[in-house]
């Protein structure tokens, strides 16, 4: 059966897609341009080494690749031959010979993969650059895998190429990319010092930048009016709990779109986000639900009902209390006070079942807003009904 897709171009959500501009990384981009500005004025007189660090999903690879495109244009305007080469070291198990071979094949596609030592292939690379009269930035992504495999000797080989060749044009500069500085501890002091002279550190994204990033991808990847703003906010909040991981946020947006399309939905609803994240992260722990009291379970059932029946991403406690009162009638129970229910909500938030935030004055006053971010409402409702049946036998 074919489904009406809400996607316009889902390739814009692919992990390898490089946007024209990396949002909220202007400072880091300016630093990269400044460190390598010599390439536009005196490219043969110096070589540069920059270490870019940041946790998963902070945009390390994207900002370096975007910089590579920009610097290539700027250097080209000066009539200088230049290439930005990006190699993921982990793809080659940190083997320096294979990494250098990959760089060589940029210029000689059929260069033999075997039969050369590390020193020989490095010299071959330098010779090719000299013959081609070209300058290069070699960006080594996941550089920690090379450090783990090769140690200080590899760092020396790469960073001290021109120490004894001052008269020759210095044609290679480096960008080293890794998550943090910890892998450098295995290197000797001299190698550590060489790598830590120029460091660009990417901080984790907070919620608002993630919203901007998601909205940018929504415009590119989805049809108009198929991704409501509260869905974008929900995904951004979830990604914030995953250490500000933009990659996670974009994947969750894509998965949510897939769940919506599979249901022939006209837009992504919060429930599809909950379904998508429950497929990525185990969310509902039966032991946690079993440990709740009767009225806690009834309040949680009220939350599940609200989000099952409404397409909103957030509710107020007043919304939930109305449904809770109906459930109390169904089970012939006297409703608990507002204060006690608020304490239950706080407990739910503590164990990760719900999230709370203060609502904006412009929308629903300063009341506390409640969301069910990671558990599909229907799944939670079924689980609670099953428990009620077992407990009342």
Protein language model features and the residues they cover:
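A short, basic N-terminal segment
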Residues: 1-47, 70-73
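Mid-core helix/loop region of P-loop NTP-binding domains shared across ATPases and GTPases
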Residues: 2-9, 14, 44, 64, ...
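Walker A/P-loop nucleotide-binding motif
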Residues: 43-68
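Conserved catalytic segments around the Walker B and adjacent sensor/switch elements
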Residues: 50, 74-91
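AAA+ ATPase "lid" subdomain C-terminal helix
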Residues: 240-246, 254-267, 307-310, 328-330, ...
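Conserved C-terminal helix/linker of AAA+ ATPases
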Residues: 259-284
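Short alpha-helical segments that sit at the start of domains
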Residues: 282-314
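Terminal-proximal interaction/regulatory segments of ATP-powered molecular machines
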Residues: 307-393
């Amino acid at each position: 059966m074919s489904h009406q897709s809400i996607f316009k171009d889902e390739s814009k959500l692919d992990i390898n897609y490089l946007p024209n501009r990396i949002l909220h990384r202007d400072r880091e981009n300016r630093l990269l341009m400044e460190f390598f500005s010599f390439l536009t004025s005196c490219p043969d007189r110096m070589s540069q080494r920059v270490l870019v660090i940041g946790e998963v999903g902070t945009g390390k690879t994207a900002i370096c690749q975007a910089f590579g495109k920009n610097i290539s244009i700027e250097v080209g305007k000066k009539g200088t031959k230049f290439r930005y080469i990006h190699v993921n070291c982990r793809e080659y198990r940190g083997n320096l010979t294979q990494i250098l071979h990959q760089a060589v094949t940029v210029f000689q596609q059929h260069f033999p993969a075997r039969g050369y030592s590390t020193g020989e292939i490095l010299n071959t690379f330098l010779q090719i650059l000299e013959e081609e009269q070209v300058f290069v930035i070699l960006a080594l992504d996941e550089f920690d895998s090379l450090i783990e495999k090769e140690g200080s000797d590899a760092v020396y080989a790469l960073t001290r190429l021109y120490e004894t060749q001052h008269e020759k044009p210095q044609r290679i500069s480096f960008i080293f990319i890794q998550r943090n500085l910890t892998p450098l501890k295995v290197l000797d002091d001299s190698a550590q010092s060489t790598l830590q002279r120029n460091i660009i550190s990417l901080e984790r994204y907070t919620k608002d930048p993630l919203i901007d990033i998601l909205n940018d991808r929504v415009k590119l990847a989805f049809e108009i009016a198929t991704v409501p703003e509260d869905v974008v906010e929900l995904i951004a909040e979830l990604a914030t709990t995953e250490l500000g991981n933009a990659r996670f946020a974009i994947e969750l947006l894509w998965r949510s779109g897939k769940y919506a399309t599979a249901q022939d939905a006209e837009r992504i609803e919060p429930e599809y986000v909950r379904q998508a994240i429950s497929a990525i992260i185990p969310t509902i722990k039966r032991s946690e639900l079993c440990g709740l009291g009767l009225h806690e379970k009834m309040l949680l059932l009220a939350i599940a009902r609200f989000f099952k029946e409404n397409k909103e991403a957030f509710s107020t406690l007043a919304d939930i209390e109305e449904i809770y009162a109906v459930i109390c009638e169904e089970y012939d129970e006297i409703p608990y006070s507002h204060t006690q229910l608020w304490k239950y909500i706080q407990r739910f938030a503590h164990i990760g079942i719900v999230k709370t935030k203060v609502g904006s004055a412009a929308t629903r006053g300063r009341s506390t807003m409640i969301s069910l971010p990671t558990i599909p409402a229907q799944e939670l409702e079924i689980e609670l009904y099953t428990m009620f049946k077992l407990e009342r036998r």
